[in-house]
Regions:
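Flexible loop and strand-edge segments within Gram-negative outer membrane beta-barrel domains
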Residues: 3-51, 56-84
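Transmembrane beta-barrel strands of outer-membrane/channel proteins
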Residues: 6-12, 52-58, 103-109, 153-157, ...
Length: 275
């Protein structure tokens, strides 16, 4: 079967910031309009399913920073517009019992521009005008090896027009134990590209930022009891990261990449369904 659907959403709002009682602000007003639309075509069959989707998001902002008592009104107002559009496709298929293979592709284009409009003359003083593209392809494979063991592995290749290409692998094993218990072990890589704001906008901006990266190791145990009414779990994790984006804490501030970071811990959860 096939399914086609779409949606459109447009929102506009005006906002005013009066400041505090001690330090009131005058004319600190914002006019914000944002819109989003998407279109998707899905397919569902006995051994395969997938979807092709397109999206477009945009925004328009007009902001008066206002002034304090005793100061002069702003002579120019901040303006900006931004957009993000893209396409996403995936198809998942089962070739034999206990198997699931998924392949997919993502593309997105994003960016925007900002400027200050001089009230007296209408002159437009340019600020930031940046556009970026990101392409990604991925494969995910899941296989039930037998009744008590499942394997999950995947890799994603991401190319960003500013920072280049990154490989993101992940893999895990799930042990299906007696009495509705399960033990999972997983290792995965994650990363985050710096945003246009972090690289190009306002005082901390730094165009030389590198993407944040981390590797996560996780071991978890869970079980269901009392006819699945009671659920509890325990999770151990260790994360090793690099290049976390942060402010250097100086004046003027500057966004920088940190050195290595480590984080580890234990999480526990429990739930009970009464009816």
């Amino acid at each position: 079967s096939w399914k086609l659907w779409g949606d459109v959403n447009v929102t506009h709002f005006n906002a005013s910031n009066p400041g505090t009682i001690q330090v009131p602000l005058i004319d600190n007003d914002s006019r914000i309009t944002r819109g989003m639309t998407s279109l998707a075509l899905e397919n569902h069959y006995e051994k395969t399913s997938g979807a092709l989707s397109l999206f477009y998001n945009w925004g328009r902002h007009k902001i008066n920073d206002g002034y304090k008592t005793g100061e002069q009104p702003q002579t120019s107002h901040f303006n900006s517009k931004d957009k993000m559009l893209g396409i996403s496709w995936y198809q998942s298929a089962t070739f034999f019992t206990g198997n699931r293979l998924t392949v997919g592709f993502d593309y997105q284009h994003f960016g925007g521009e900002s400027w200050n409009k001089v009230l007296a003359t209408g002159e437009r003083k340019p600020g930031v005008d940046k556009q970026m593209d990101e392409f990604a392809g991925y494969v995910d494979f899941r296989q039930d090896i037998n009744s008590w063991l499942s394997l999950d592995a995947g890799v994603r290749v991401d190319h960003h027009s500013h920072v280049g290409t990154e490989w993101i692998p992940q893999g895990g094993l799930a042990f299906h134990l007696p009495k509705s218990a399960e033990l999972k072990a997983m290792v995965s890589k994650g990363y985050r590209n710096p945003t246009i704001r972090e690289m190009y906008m306002f005082a901390p901006a730094n165009p030389e930022l590198n993407p944040e990266k981390l590797v996560s190791y996780e071991l978890s145990y869970s079980q269901r009891l009392l006819e699945d009414a009671l659920y509890y779990g325990l999770n151990l994790y260790y994360i090793n990261g690099d290049n976390v984006i942060m402010s250097n804490g100086l004046t003027p501030p500057l966004n920088v990449n940190s050195g290595e970071i480590e984080n580890w811990g234990i999480e526990a959860n429990i739930g009970y369904r009464f009816n």
